Amino acid sequence: MRVTDFSFELPESLIAHYPQPERSRCRLLSLEGPTGALTHGTFTDLLDKLNPGDVLVFNNTRVIPARLFGRKASGGKIEVLVERMLDDKRILAHIRASKAPKPGTELLLGDDENIHATMTARHGALFEVEFNDERPVLDILNAIGHMPLPPYIDRPDEDADRELYQTVYSEKPGAVAAPTAGLHFDKPLLAALREKGIEMAFVTLHVGAGTFQPVRVDTIEDHIMHSEYAEVPQEVVDAVLAAKARGNRVIAVGTTSVRSLESAAQAAKSDLIEPFFGDTQIFIYPGYQYKVIDALVTNFHLPESTLIMLVSAFAGYEHTMNAYKAAVEQKYRFFSYGDAMFITYNPQAIFERVGE
């Protein structure tokens, strides 16, 4: 399977640089997995698509202000993008500089360059940085960090992004990108879903900067997925198993919820799904046998990205690419601040041959 099989033409004008004024007023393209049928509507139509007893699984990670600017004490400018917080003093980060810092290099971070840190070690493409400050890492990031807007949102971050680029239910700090399907849920919609008897469960997957890395191989099977930390607690497992037992559906809100649940299912020893706490490198592409998810809420993803591959494995390649073609024709807004899809599972997707 070739990466170019997942390419599509996207006019620049369809990339959303700001969210809709009202979270739940975005457009919703519904794709019926088994047939490929498409329906156009608005996000609140989701209420009519779910049944009492269905379980929505959200990712409750919270985006940290992960982008830092500064310089080496010796002079050269640097940009630091936190990949993950290791503890209260140390981070693992990508560093952009004219010359990569060596272990022991002193860094002056923040717009005022008044936060002192040291690059202590290198781990492949990532740098371990230790802050020489009494405050915990998260407090430092909240004080001097910028929101890490994705590279395709071509503007500086603004104060408003600190809330707009978070889900309303975000709770556990650690992500450097928002689980964007969740951005469309506002408090009134969540209340209406509860009122209807829709159950809600929360996993945690701290989205890493690797989510924006392009696939740099020609053949999909050669791609090595980045690693991210995920938690699927016992109460989520219980909710999933109970829903399956009574004939209800499990609906993942976002690809990060998919990857969390499917990681927990892959690692399970005796049941369909068991609690999972750890790093996952799960890479879902056509041919993958889904184990847990019955439907998916997701945004529109980048051409040739691992996320459009995940969607293709769920809905079927032809159905997915047709839906994207229709979305472009109908001028849906794309990517993190864009519109959404509601997709039901296509059990025939696993048998589809891509690029033959």
Swiss-Prot record:
Entries under Pfam families matching the protein: Queuosine_synth (PF02547)
Keywords, alphabetical: Cytoplasm, Queuosine biosynthesis, S-adenosyl-L-methionine, Transferase
Coiled-coil ranges (or none): none
EC number assigned by the record: 2.4.99.17
InterPro entries: QueA, QueA_dom1, QueA_dom2, QueA_sf
A GO term for molecular function: S-adenosylmethionine:tRNA ribosyltransferase-isomerase activity
Pathway recorded for this protein: tRNA modification; tRNA-queuosine biosynthesis
Biological process terms in GO annotation: queuosine biosynthetic process; tRNA wobble guanine modification
SUPFAM superfamilies: QueA-like (SSF111337)
Entry annotated with the keyword ATP-binding: no
Signal sequence extent: none
Superkingdom of source: Bacteria
Compartment list: Cytoplasm
Record field: catalytic activity: 7-aminomethyl-7-carbaguanosine(34) in tRNA + S-adenosyl-L-methionine = epoxyqueuosine(34) in tRNA + adenine + L-methionine + 2 H(+)
UniProt record similarity statement: Belongs to the QueA family.
PANTHER family the record matches: S-ADENOSYLMETHIONINE:TRNA RIBOSYLTRANSFERASE-ISOMERASE (PTHR30307:SF0)
Subunit organization: Monomer.
Annotated function: Transfers and isomerizes the ribose moiety from AdoMet to the 7-aminomethyl group of 7-deazaguanine (preQ1-tRNA) to give epoxyqueuosine (oQ-tRNA).
Protein name: S-adenosylmethionine:tRNA ribosyltransferase-isomerase
Annotated organism of origin: Salmonella arizonae (strain ATCC BAA-731 / CDC346-86 / RSK2980)
Gene: queA
